[in-house]
């Protein structure tokens, strides 16, 4: 086995422990010895000076990094910087000028384009596999904080992480990062690559500033579901719904409001909340952007000067009284929120609304994601302070559906019924 291959976590998932440890003969009968953990991955030389793009998870925690080229030459590498939020790392090889790959433009990649995955799967040596681009803009997979993956069926296996995804002109369009596998650890035709435009942006910031800074709007956003689209009288499932606005954020200062739907940035359509988040994150603090928002049936443009993404988020708070239990429409039981219940839910005592005390598991409310303990504060943008107001508001919304503002553990989200 190539040195270190058996320590790769993907290798262990695929083959188990049957091959023994480092230095073993595969029979598992070596004497115990002190071991040094090793792992492997791939990378791409992107400049003649020897800068290399790879994944953060390939080098995370490494004390020494060694790079072996396809011609068997070996080089020590310095980790210049990393960005765990996108899983990008930048390395620097020590040595003379290097042959570098040509960087492409990932915005020009189309579904159906040929794609080649280049890397060192299982440590067997440089390997090229071929497929097509299966999809673009894959997000919300829970792999990284910022996701805009190119999906490909070009076979990607353990050891390919950090390697190149190239187009039919040999241009680098992505950094292979992850595979979707049902327990085997091997390729099943669904691989994901970070677009080169995103990787290039991160690398540029690391080289220029030594760190990555991101633009910040100061809003909490969520996707537009079909039920929400109906409640908001929208014709298309596009944009990002603003479910909360930071009291001290740039969006608040510019006039963005909770319940706005952000449809565009600088004249470009925003397809969903993931695209909005990624687009803002690639912009720099201090940059002014023009947001196109939908509000109360009309659209307007709002200019926002971006701040810098903070390490923590501001939490939204609201305002209370007592009331009896009420059976509401669409499968939920609610009760007017009092100060004692607000304290139990770790909300300010002054919070007003109705607390969900029960949800019928076969009801539309359960399907929409409402939970016991949720605090409903608005129905169709109108505040509700007690169970009676909530009941009346829900009765009026039977025809077109209801858009509920829900406070869940101090965070507000919209739920459509």
Predicted regions and their residues:
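Active-site substrate-binding loop(s) of clan PA
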Residues: 68, 78-80, 97-124, 157, ...
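C-terminal recognition in membrane/secretory proteostasis and scaffolding
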Residues: 35-38, 42-44, 48-51, 56, ...
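Short histidine-centered loop motifs in beta-beta connectors
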Residues: 100-108, 158-159, 176, 245-246, ...
């Amino acid at each position: 086995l190539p040195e270190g291959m058996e320590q790769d976590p993907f290798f262990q998932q695929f083959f188990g422990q049957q091959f023994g440890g480092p230095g073993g003969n595969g029979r598992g009968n070596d004497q115990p010895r002190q071991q040094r953990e090793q792992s492997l991955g791939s990378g791409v030389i992107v400049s003649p000076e020897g800068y290399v793009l790879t994944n953060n998870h390939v080098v995370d925690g490494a004390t020494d990094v060694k790079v072996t080229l396809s011609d068997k030459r070996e080089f020590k590498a310095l980790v210049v910087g990393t960005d765990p939020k996108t899983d990008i790392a930048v390395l620097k090889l020590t040595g003379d000028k290097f042959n570098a790959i040509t960087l492409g433009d990932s915005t020009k990649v189309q579904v159906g384009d040929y794609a080649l995955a280049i890397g060192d799967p299982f440590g067997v040596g440089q390997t090229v596999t071929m497929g097509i681009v299966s999809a673009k803009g894959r997000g919300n997979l829970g792999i990284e904080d910022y996701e805009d993956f190119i999906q490909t069926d070009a076979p990607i296996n353990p050891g390919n992480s950090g390697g190149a995804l190239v187009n039919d002109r040999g241009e680098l369009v992505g950094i292979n990062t992850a595979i979707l596998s049902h327990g085997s650890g091997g390729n099943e035709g669904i691989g994901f690559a970070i677009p080169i435009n995103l990787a290039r942006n991160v690398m540029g910031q690391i080289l220029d500033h030594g760190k990555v800074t991101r633009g910040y709007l100061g809003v909490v956003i969520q996707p537009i579901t079909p039920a929400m689209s109906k409640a908001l009288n929208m014709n298309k499932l596009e944009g990002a719904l603003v479910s909360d606005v930071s009291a001290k954020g740039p969006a608040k200062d510019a006039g963005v409001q909770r319940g706005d739907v952000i449809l565009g940035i600088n004249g470009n359509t925003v397809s969903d909340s993931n695209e909005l988040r990624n687009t803002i994150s690639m912009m720099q603090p201090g940059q002014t952007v023009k947001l196109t928002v939908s509000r109360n049936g009309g659209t307007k443009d709002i200019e926002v000067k971006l701040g810098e993404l903070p390490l923590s988020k501001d939490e939204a708070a609201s305002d209370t009284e007592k009331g009896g239990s009420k059976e509401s429409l669409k499968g939920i039981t609610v009760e007017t929120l009092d100060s004692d219940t607000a304290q139990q839910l770790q909300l300010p005592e002054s919070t007003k609304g109705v607390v969900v005390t029960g949800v019928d598991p076969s009801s539309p409310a359960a399907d929409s994601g409402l939970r016991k303990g949720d605090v409903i504060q608005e129905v169709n943008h109108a505040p509700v302070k007690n169970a009676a107001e909530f009941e009346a508001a829900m009765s009026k919304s039977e025809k077109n559906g209801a858009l509920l503002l829900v406070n869940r553990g101090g965070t507000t989200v919209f739920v459509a019924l």
